[in-house]
Swiss-Prot record:
Function: Involved in base excision repair of DNA damaged by oxidation or by mutagenic agents. Acts as a DNA glycosylase that recognizes and removes damaged bases. Has a preference for oxidized purines, such as 7,8-dihydro-8-oxoguanine (8-oxoG). Has AP (apurinic/apyrimidinic) lyase activity and introduces nicks in the DNA strand. Cleaves the DNA backbone by beta-delta elimination to generate a single-strand break at the site of the removed base with both 3'- and 5'-phosphates.
Naturally occurring in which organism (per UniProt): Halorhodospira halophila (strain DSM 244 / SL1) (Ectothiorhodospira halophila (strain DSM 244 / SL1))
Residues reported in the UniProt entry to bind DNA: 92, 111, 153
GO MF: 8-oxo-7,8-dihydroguanine DNA N-glycosylase activity; class I DNA-(apurinic or apyrimidinic site) endonuclease activity; damaged DNA binding; zinc ion binding
Family: Belongs to the FPG family.
Protein name: Formamidopyrimidine-DNA glycosylase
PROSITE patterns: FPG_CAT, ZF_FPG_1, ZF_FPG_2
Cofactors named for this entry: Zn(2+)
Amino acid sequence: MPELPEVETTRRGLQVHLVGRTLQRVVVRQRQLRYPVPARVEAAVVGEEVVALERRAKYLLIRLGGGAWLLLHLGMSGSLRLVAETDAPGRHDHVDLVLNDGRAVRLTDPRRFGCLLLGDGDPQDHRLLRRLGPEPLGSAFDGAVLHRAARGRRVAVKALLMDATVVVGVGNIYANEALFRAGIRPDRAAGRIARARYDRLAGAVRAVLEAALAAGGTTLRDFTDGSGEPGYFAVNLSVYGASVCPVCGGALRQIRLAQRGTWFCPRCQR
């Protein structure tokens, strides 16, 4: 699944090509995504200038000059790529946002768990956005946020870290990596972790995500950035999918937490 670094990499790659352009038309080949593509989207955005391309959590927000906006999510296997308008679509190319320069932003989604929604007003009031927690790379996120959310809870700390109402964008790969950097077992009860350790964990989350952004995201199966290039952070993963601890040389343990593969070092993580 494209996680926060992958979505932000896509945003950065497309922003320079999209902002300031006009949407000439929208081509919808498949409406049945996670949520149906609105029937009025084609008529609503034609002739509108793109004034901003933003990200909130794992959602991309295309703001248009007339006040409307498009909200996109890449789902489990989706991507957005800049292509020539004349490029023949593939089987899983479901939507084209055609620009006034002969190019199009193409939504590809083999598993159809992504979405393209239309709205106006404040997008932060949308039902998909309004309950989201702070951005992990923003000033509102720190150890205090995690410590408050964990108070009195027996849930595993990894599950807390992946709860988008606590902090957004920390998916399975990066939760594994951040907990390793912070020296915290992923199955430890969240409410039994001291504030100082949460300070360390918040710093580890930031460091892991910043490193992934610098590398262009993590490619495991489907992710490509806005130009179709893969991300390269997978070569820098410390524990996710690995068998040997890079610090102590001991064997890593693999367990399942909340139905997700989880790796940790029983020596280095307590």
